[in-house]
């Protein structure tokens, strides 16, 4: 309710209804045919989805994460990943948010704990480009 700035549960509206424009994946970010897409059902992308099992089945122990709402969507996923023994790499300048002071608190918490790694788009792009082709994946 606080995110939508309403004081009555009856006034809360779902913003991300399947098959609506706000739910669509941008063309520039469209997954390849060999990439899986999981609908995020809760604050953490791991809650109610097969994401953890998929990552473990593929032998993935670390992953990059970015998105629209650092303070309400990305942070819960990052902390859940840490609890699961995974290494989240937060691409800080590819994370948006509505409440800048809350975003700063989240980043400060990440830095304080040392569990998630923090990077920026330029660094992760350079590192991914430098990978040998055998590591590049499909």
Residue spans of the language-model regions?
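Active-site-adjacent betaalpha module
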Residues: 2-138
């Amino acid at each position: 309710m606080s995110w939508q700035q309403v004081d009555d549960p009856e006034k809360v509206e779902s913003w991300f209804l399947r098959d609506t424009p706000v739910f669509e994946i941008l063309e520039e970010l469209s997954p390849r045919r060999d990439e899986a897409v999981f609908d995020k059902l809760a604050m953490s992308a791991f809650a109610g989805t097969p994401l953890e099992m998929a990552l473990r089945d593929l032998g993935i122990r670390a992953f990059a994460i970015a998105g629209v709402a650092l303070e309400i969507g990305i942070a819960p996923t990052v902390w859940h990943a840490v609890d699961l023994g995974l290494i989240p790499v937060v691409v800080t300048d590819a994370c948006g948010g509505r409440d800048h002071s809350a975003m700063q608190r989240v980043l400060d918490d990440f830095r304080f704990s040392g569990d998630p790694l923090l990077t920026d788009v330029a660094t992760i792009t350079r590192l991914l480009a430098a990978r040998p082709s055998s590591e590049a994946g499909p």
